[in-house]
Amino acid sequence: MLSCDICGETVSSEPDMKAHLLIVHMENEVICPFCKLSGVNYDEMCFHIETAHFEQNELERNFERINTVQYGISDNRKDSSLQCRADINSSVHSACASNQPKISAQSLPKDGTLKHKDFYSENLTESRKFLKSTEKQSDRTKIKESIYETMYSPPECPFCGKIEDNSQDMETHVKTKHADLLDTPLEDCNQLLYDCPMCGLVCTNYHILQEHVDLHLEESSFGQGVNRVQCSRDLELAQQLQQEEDRKRRSEESRQEMEEFQKLQRQYGLDNSGGYKQQQLRNMEIEVNRGRMHPSEFHRRKADMMESLAIGVDDGKTKTSGIMEALYRYYQNAATDVRRVWLSAGVDHFHSSFGDKGWGCGYRNFQMLLSSLLQNDAYDDSLKGMSVPCIPKIQSMIEDAWKEGFDPQGASQLNDKLQGTKAWIGACEIYTLLTSLRIKCRIVDFHKSTGPLGTHPRLFEWILSYYASEREGSPKVVCTSKPPIYLQHQGHSRTVVGIEEKKNRTLCLLVFDPGCPSREMQKLLKHDMEVSSLKQLRKFVGNLKHKQYQIVAVEGVLSSEEKIARRQASQVFTAEKIP
């Protein structure tokens, strides 16, 4: 269809348009349909309409084509042409409106028209200027058009999400498919209304509401799915971090446990670093390297040690004898602050050597106790032909007692092996060894303090009752026939050889410590013994503050039947507890 630029009439073909122009406009007087301009030919009228009234003339004729440009349906070349014409028309129309003089009713001719020469001369110049300016703006228009087309997206239905090609199709879709939603509910009517529980939209149909809510749920499920994926990833990461932390913790615990185990092995001499012989040789070599021992002395001592180990008898190089006799003389002639003192039977002091330094206190205390028993005729039957054994021999004797069936729990703890190790021994091993020799003894466990500040006054009272059967009427110095007492606490052991009672009734133990070297003990052998020399022997109540103490006290000789009974009882080892 073709439309006449002058009157707007539409014809079906180009020949019809030519006939229309000839008959209607060229043969008759041409009059502007907008401003009544007349007296011009056809070409001039077309130019006038194109420049002065293009917007009014094209508004209805190009409405559809302009919409097509806005929705991006036409090709780029046609869109650019139409957009350019629309811009030109708008600008020319505004230019005409601003530049042409206002025409009042009095200035118009009686027939209501304007002559060509009155109008043409005023607007022709402005029209030509505008056409030149539009040529410069055409390139900008094309750029704007491409940007607009790039940013455009097809319209989407707000109810169901369907996408249409243009706004007219979308409007048709909404009117046909969602007409119920477009109706405004009437007041005071009985029509049921359905509110969306999520966004508050009012629907007149339950099925429409259901579709609308389904859209909400789809969006929500998508978001929840994303959240679930994220949560799953977070949970997986948290589990990995927890597993890594647990692995590191277990590894650290295993490392610390191994270090503690190795420390205990070294502490108790079970680290396979050798026993008495190896340590003796190693320490003597160190002394030679430091210049403290001559090589000839090293070889002499090594030979003596090998001989001692071969016969199983202590070489006596760490022994100090005669101390008990020296103590008796001292208390008889001095010690004015002492009310009464009880001394054990004769006993030799043994101290640690290069071979057992740091772990041999239990063995040295046994040597002290055995040295006293060997001087007592009451134990000759049990200790017939025995001498004070060396430390490796004592280890062998304890292993033999385990083999007889004594203290299986203790044997298991030490892997049934003492020889060739630096394993410590305590009250249980001393009891086991003495019982296997048919020496009657008892273990008393002072498992907790019985006095203020962690002291053990009950321990002192028990030792006093052991040595002093009758305190009143006895002389100041009492030399008893009782053997010394083995005294054990955590990490160390000593031998109790007597007890003092001060004039203020306080008690003080006299103990031999295997950690005290011979040169210090020999100071007690002097006739003019000083009080300061006794300081290393005296232990008051306030000096013994360990949490637990155990003592092994000898009480006589066992018969063969009693030995068997005690061996059976040692299967589950128990001790007398005080308190």
UniProtKB/Swiss-Prot annotation:
Positions of C2H2-type zinc fingers: 2-25, 30-53, 155-178, 194-216
Region (MIU): 227-249
Site (Involved in the stabilization of negative charge on the oxyanion by the formation of the oxyanion hole): Q488
GO molecular function terms noted in the UniProt entry: cysteine-type deubiquitinase activity; zinc ion binding
Family: Belongs to the peptidase C78 family. ZUFSP subfamily.
Domain remark in the UniProt entry: The motif interacting with ubiquitin (MIU) and ZUFSP ubiquitin-binding domain (zUBD, also called ZUFSP helical arm ZHA) are responsible for binding the distal (outgoing) ubiquitin units S1 and S2 respectively. C2H2-type zinc finger 4 is a ubiquitin-binding zinc finger (UBZ) and required for polyubiquitin binding, possibly binding the proximal ubiqutin, and for catalytic activity. C2H2-type zinc fingers 1-3 are required for localization to sites of DNA damage.
Function according to Swiss-Prot or TrEMBL: Deubiquitinase with endodeubiquitinase activity that specifically interacts with and cleaves 'Lys-63'-linked long polyubiquitin chains. Shows only weak activity against 'Lys-11' and 'Lys-48'-linked chains. Plays an important role in genome stability pathways, functioning to prevent spontaneous DNA damage and also promote cellular survival in response to exogenous DNA damage. Modulates the ubiquitination status of replication protein A (RPA) complex proteins in response to replication stress.
UniProt name for this protein: Zinc finger-containing ubiquitin peptidase 1
Organism, as annotated: Bos taurus
Lineage summary: Eukaryota, Metazoa, Chordata, Craniata, Vertebrata
